[in-house]
């Protein structure tokens, strides 16, 4: 195969785009930005992203997809009140919104119409921040080579959040207006108003810290799930197994946290060696068991009562 010989490209992410191919001859253009859906290879040629996402990539996308759902559930529970019968329907609606948004996002991504995506492999942290690596050969002129080297892991999250927001605005107000009769008029839509705040925050978080989240999300899941489980069990004054079993809601919260623990462990281990990594899942119930065994020494109910009395 004959390839035209040109000077090497400057910069970490500048590449040459294929202009013409005739049999065994390939003609490439000048160094510049690669088209969307391509990234540079070791020879500085722009190559299409044709690989399948790794398990870790899917786990990252799952984490980013879970964030709005968890926040929806939190604010629905926060504003619905203990006696509100609308909370369950809103929880189900939020799950439906996020699920449909994820499916639609996959369908509109390349290749269009299938629940499958093509991607470029993430090699290092700088792949997420190509705008920081535009070369300046003469220290005056900058060659702009910014492109999505981690295609589509960066932009697909924004598309998903957009569909989540659209579906929420189409479905949730009608549901809340119809069934949230136990709430005051000012409280009915507070969970929706909260979403209008946290979606922009999540968008900025992905835009600025997407690369950092990609490498840190397993540890974020483990730390937050451990902290929130301890806070919930303490606030609910759960000091033994009986306190845990008297209400179904407490069991649902416990199992949800166990799923998050397992998700974080699998993400950290990446299940590279299945027979060695699966036993790690036996650690999932350990934090809850440790709390129950040590609660009698700390007496969280006494601490809460003293805090409420201002002592």
Curated annotation (Swiss-Prot):
Compartment(s) of residence: Endoplasmic reticulum membrane
* UniProt keyword annotation of RNA-binding present: no
Q: Which residues lie on this side of the membrane: Lumenal?
A: 1-57, 109-149, 210, 272-277
Membrane topology is: Multi-pass membrane protein
| Species per Swiss-Prot/TrEMBL record | Mus musculus (Mouse)
Tissue expression per record: Expressed in numerous tissues, including brain, spleen, thymus, liver, kidney and testis.
Q: Does Transmembrane helix show up as a keyword for this record?
A: yes
Task: Kindly state the subunit structure of this protein.
Answer: Interacts with RNF5 and MAPK8, but not with MAPK9. Binding to MAPK8 occurs before and after exposure to stress, such as UV irradiation. After exposure to stress, interacts with phosphorylated MAPK8. Competes with DUSP10 for MAPK8 binding. Associates with multiple components of the proteasome and with ERAD regulatory proteins, including AMFR/GP78, CANX, PSMC1, PSMC2, PSMC3/TBP1, PSMC5, PSMC6, PSMD8, SEC61-ALPHA and UFD1.
What biological processes does GO assign it?
ERAD pathway; response to unfolded protein
Pfam families on file:
JAMP
Q: Enumerate the UniProt keywords alphabetically.
A: Endoplasmic reticulum, Glycoprotein, Membrane, Transmembrane, Transmembrane helix, Ubl conjugation, Unfolded protein response
Where do the record's glycosylation annotations fall on this chain?
22
> Per its record, how is this protein called by name?
JNK1/MAPK8-associated membrane protein
Parts of the chain on the Cytoplasmic side? 79-87, 171-188, 232-250, 299-311
Q: How is it modified after translation?
A: Ubiquitinated by RNF5 via 'Lys-63'-linked ubiquitin linkage in a UBE2N-dependent manner. Ubiquitination decreases association with components of the proteasome and ERAD.
The record's GO CC annotations read: endoplasmic reticulum membrane
Q: What does this protein do?
A: Regulates the duration of MAPK8 activity in response to various stress stimuli. Facilitates degradation of misfolded endoplasmic reticulum (ER) proteins through the recruitment of components of the proteasome and endoplasmic reticulum-associated degradation (ERAD) system.
